[in-house]
Regions:
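Single-stranded RNA-binding regions, centering on S1/OB-family and related RNA-binding modules
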Residues: 1-106
Length: 106
């Protein structure tokens, strides 16, 4: 995969604040990684933005988290995730996404 912008399959639940989500990824090592991300980086399983009321307390959905591909090594990819970490994940949980449009004032 040559895309710089990717999605990672994960489990998503509500964070402590209305504009954040808790995500859980499976790492290439088999370990689970739990992090926090702004809601704008989280998507439903089919790639749609999460509605503000889509996550109820104590519920978890299967979804996607936005990430940047750092290195693709075939079966394993190194990605930067929204909480600032770089992790190794199985290439099987990575899917392509469209780059975000930059808005610059003139």
């Amino acid at each position: 995969m040559n895309a710089k912008f990717v999605y990672l399959e994960c489990q998503i639940s509500a964070g402590a604040f209305s504009d954040e989500c808790v995500f859980e990824l499976k790492l290439a090592s088999g370990d689970e990684y739990i992090g926090i991300a702004p809601r704008k980086y989280c998507r439903t399983e089919d790639g749609h933005k999460l509605a503000s009321d889509s996550l109820q307390k104590k519920s978890t959905i299967t979804g996607k988290i936005a990430a940047r591909l750092i290195r693709n090594g075939g079966d394993v990819a190194v990605v930067a995730i929204p909480d600032g970490e770089a992790v190794e994940v199985s290439a099987g949980i990575v899917s392509q996404r469209e780059p975000e449009t930059s808005h610059v004032s003139v």
